Amino acid sequence: MPLKILVAQINCVVGDVATNASKILSIVDQAKSESVDLVVTPELSLCGYPPEDLLLRPDFLKECHLTLKRIANHISGITLIVGHPHREGHYLYNAASVIQDGQIVARYFKQELPNYRVFDEARYFKAGEQSVVFSVAGVSVGLNICEDVWGEGGREASTESKVIEHPARAVSSVKESGADLLVVMNASPFHSGKDLIRRKVVQTQARLHTLPIVFCNLIGGQDELVFDGGSFSCDRNGEISAQAVFFNESLMTITLDQEQISSEFKERLLDSERATYEALVLGVRDYVEKNSFPGVLIGLSGGIDSALTLAVAVDALGAKRVKAVMMPSQFTASMSREDASTMASGLGVDYSEIEIKPMFDSFMKGLSGEFLGKAFDTTEENLQSRIRGTLLMSLSNKFGSLVLTTGNKSEMSTGYATLYGDMAGGFAVLKDLTKQAVYRLSVYRNTISACIPERIIERPPTAELRADQLDEDSLPSYEILDAIVEHYVEYDRGVDEIVALGYLPEDVKKIVWLIHVNEHKRRQSPPGVRVTARGFGKDWRYPITSKYRGLIDQ
């Protein structure tokens, strides 16, 4: 008899146990009406992922335990797998419970606990040791949780895109226990190219074990992380048999008939620019919605960073929930004002202009005695930025909207940003995009609709904090800068390795030096969407006080 499976690719809110449970039960009721045998939910679906130090609170764990019991009481005539934290004795486990007819008939504890980059599960959980295989409609189903299927090569696959052709021990254990099918519950966060890596990992394990696999992933934004969904299944030969959508909830049905696994869900993978853009949109939307902000504020400069930020915000929230503010100074070019106004008008957002020169002049008058005999320098440049930051935060304070900052990864790497100025805000949309990536995504966004004026994309980047200023007056070309940042930050390559790739030693040394001396700035920056293999968030934990400079004196 065929086994009908519903893969519940859902957006779970961290800490909102009751709402997550209600969503799961609603899906179960729908599945029963469609004669589904088995409902699969993502990793830690009951409490959301990652719950971080909520896992250290006894009251939080108690709520999860009591809610799980209530869910179990509701289940009849169907099998549900739900992810949750579970305390047993002195130990806490990343668990999955199998519920049938009001009873928890099996419970699995995750065996491979990732403890690298954005993951720190060893801080909270003890690794499980036993495989679990249970029966549904005459089919023996095994369970794994996320990293289990990646096995010993999980770190290399996730961070370096190297998939090891080696059987994962948790998968082997399930196969040896007689499983006909493996279900993998996941909370696997997005970065560019991760979808292909996941596929290759799972296909490899399916082929090595001649075992069909169903991969259920979480979707949604959680602070800096975005979970992109893209759940799928593959047959015992590793051939993809079903593919769910990315960046949206999905209830994907799959049928296992003997050894054949089939589905009508055949979504396509997304290209890199589209996937990254949709990650930004989902990250902004969920950060705003889940934290109950009424809308967002953006300082619109007429430059490409704020233009892309505005486009993402409107796509995430709609024009009515976005306000753009242009704050020109005596150094602002007329084309900047024109382009900012044109873009805001085209998108239909609330737009206003506030001249900052009167405020700047007042500050300079007040500081004239202290600054007597001192030439104009970055102090006056940063003062303009801090005036703008103060204005945006005042509007945020008055109306409750969240300020979206517009700085990019190139600027965050080198400290080309002003503390309490353009860094002032609550969420940094472009924080993990290099300047060149900002240009690529802006071009991509204009293929959907031409909302970013071409002149913004074509003109040389400038902060417009002094006369005739260009970014490359202070920094190497972004082509060189971005490449060095990617090698050093994302792939941990050393100075000598990067120089050996053909970059000038002076450029590499300068950029690496800037990366390390600006750690104090990054530590005070708002969270932002992670879209690369390594961002400046949970997966970048360098000390502020440190003399290390990448061995650049050797």
What are these regions (language model features)?
Residues 3, 210-211, 236, 264-301, ...:
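ATP/NTP-dependent adenylation/nucleotidyl-transfer catalytic domains that generate, transfer
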